[in-house]
Amino acid sequence: MRTSFGGAAVLALVVGCATAAGAQGWLTDARRIGLGGLGLDQGSLRRYNAAYRAVPGRAGQHGRPKLTIPIPLGLIQFFHDHPISNIKNDPAFNHDSAGFNPVKLLNTFLNPPLFLEVKQAPTPTNDVVFGIGKDSLRVDLGQTARLVPQDQFGIGGSSRPLDPGLSIKGVRVGVMGWVHDEVGFQLGDKLLGFLRDSVPADTNTRYNVLGDAVLEAGFAPTVAYARRIAGDNTTGLYVGGALHYYVGLAYARVSGDGGFTTGDSIFGGPTPVKPDARALTQYSKFGNSFGHGVGADLGIAVVTGPIELGVGVNDVGATITWPDTRVDSALYRDSSFSKPVANHIETKTKLPVSYLVNLAYTVGKTTLGADVLNSGRGTTVHIGGEQRVGVIVLRGGVARDQRKRIEFGWGGGLRFGGLGLDVGFWTHTNSLSNQRGITMATSLAIY
């Protein structure tokens, strides 16, 4: 049991790193981290604005690197402190250890240690106060109670991990990889009051959690076109569009409701609580008939002297039809029971529409910019800039994340011929604390 728990924790950590990097690719690039998440180069903007494939690079700005390689100082430190060979006895992963802190473990998953934490956000302790009477139960989680989400909590969005293609005179033909993932849950009112507000447990009452998760992935043959329709390189109007034929390789969705119901007495009787759960799963596994759908990207960009403005929208009308889906139901109440509901049925899913509005101002070796980005799970705002002085680049930025919290980024880099070394710092409060931590990111860029 201990070995499997530790192994699952390490696997979750690795998946967390991959998910973070995939969902927000800038997390592996110290340049964008130093800008607070702002993407100033055309390579970053092309992801969300099809018109930018025709927009020339800004004068005086470094070109886009051919390859960015993160330097994972955080993982090196993490596995030095938590050797895999001793994972089953490590207090961080061994739930039987007196030093085990599940809040700290979850915090590690929410902030995968790809890079080095130079200031860790304080993690609430295990201190919990129980009030137990003859027929009453009350739990005071102390500082940890602030971490209990009051509203629906979730992560996810859409990403394009691969997008190779060939361009000829504004026409581009390629194959795009796509992934859509969503995970969310919400505490029932009774359980929320019990955990967050220390409301005493009541008899004959159900305490539950609602959950929902979606994962689908595939590829999309793409035809795109971008060109300047007015002006010249210094003052011009650019438009672009892309048509995708989405091919779905696999799809899964789970919706569930789990909890327990108290009896006539909190502690008396043979069954003081009765656990129960129900779930509905839909899936089209790899090897079934492919999903299919059509969607489009649209973009426009305006360049007028030192000012650049763009608006891009992705996955417009992208509805995926899965022709061979199976639906199962599962129920637990005293014992588990599952049964097929339907098979070989058609299911439709919809990719979230993402958009980016960006503004940049370049004068000499100074570039300032801002953007508003929504990739399917809330809106983020980035403002930042960089100053180039010879081989040195200085960067800084500020962001408002999806939870409307303000974060900061700063950093710099050195460029020697075709090789660049960058370092970036950013604050984060997505850990299980109301105070900020600071992470240092490092990466190599090959131009």
Predicted regions and their residues:
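Short hydrophobic "helix-edge" motifs at membrane interfaces and signal-peptide entry regions
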Residues: A8, L38-L40, T304-P306
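Outer-membrane beta-barrel porins/channels
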Residues: Q24-A30, S167-Y447
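A broad, structure-centric signal for solvent-exposed, well-ordered loop/edge residues
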Residues: G7-A8, Q42, A54, I320-P323
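Bacterial N-terminal signal peptides that target proteins for export
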Residues: M1-A9
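Bacterial N-terminal signal peptides
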Residues: A8-C17
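N-terminal, post-signal peptide beta-strand-biased segments of exported outer-membrane/organellar beta-barrel
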Residues: A20-V173, W178, Y447
